[in-house]
């Protein structure tokens, strides 16, 4: 009697112990698949982020008058671009510099502008942009000229991927106004093909 009682629990335990390893194996497979998918998503996100470059144009300490007194914070002006015809200018405010820069980068990516580039990494036509009291004039240049501009205007043009251009600043010298004026000028650029289509003429008539 003692032998039969001792053997029956062993059989039950052996049968019950065989089920959990199979379930554990399935869970491990699911986890490994999820990790692979998550790894692919992370890689894609890193590749997208690696295409973009950020440059801080200005960091200022600003204050806001509230009921309890003055609240101090930092304001960062950031230019974001991929040097392939996309560029944006963003402004971020936070209690620390790092937070302000991060908000500026996020704001810049929300306000991207596509710039039509020529084979010589220049712009197709002359353009003028204005923001507040600042005015910026940009015109195409021959290969080897470089970026003839200064301040925040130069930063915007370089991150847009323009390598040969002439720019002139008129009016206000404020970095934010100049950067936004340059963005307005770039947003108004059109390719020769698009201009011909809008005017209803051929490309030969534009070049002539």
From Swiss-Prot:
* Disordered, as annotated region: 1-54
- Any stretches that span the bilayer, and where are they? none
- Does the record bear 4Fe-4S in its keywords? no
Keywords linked to the UniProt accession: Ribonucleoprotein, Ribosomal protein, RNA-binding, rRNA-binding
Biased composition annotated in UniProt, kind: Polar residues: 1-15
Q: Does the keyword RNA-binding apply?
A: yes
**For the S5 DRBM domain, which residue ranges apply?**
52-115
Q: Name one GO molecular function term.
A: structural constituent of ribosome
Q: Which cysteines are joined by disulfide bonds?
A: none
InterPro entries given for it? Ribosomal_Su5_D2-typ_SF, Ribosomal_uS5, Ribosomal_uS5_bac-type, Ribosomal_uS5_C, Ribosomal_uS5_N, Ribosomal_uS5_N_CS, Ribsml_uS5_D2-typ_fold_subgr
Ranges of Basic and acidic residues composition bias in the record: 25-37, 44-54
Q: Which GO terms describe its biological process?
A: translation
Q: Which GO CC terms are listed, alphabetically?
A: small ribosomal subunit
- Family from the record: Belongs to the universal ribosomal protein uS5 family.
Quoted from the entry, the domain comment is: The N-terminal domain interacts with the head of the 30S subunit; the C-terminal domain interacts with the body and contacts protein S4. The interaction surface between S4 and S5 is involved in control of translational fidelity.
Function noted in UniProt: With S4 and S12 plays an important role in translational accuracy. Located at the back of the 30S subunit body where it stabilizes the conformation of the head with respect to the body.
Oligomeric and partner information: Part of the 30S ribosomal subunit. Contacts proteins S4 and S8.
Q: What is this protein called?
A: Small ribosomal subunit protein uS5
Organism field: Prochlorococcus marinus (strain NATL2A)
**Taxonomic path:** Bacteria, Bacillati, Cyanobacteriota, Cyanophyceae, Synechococcales
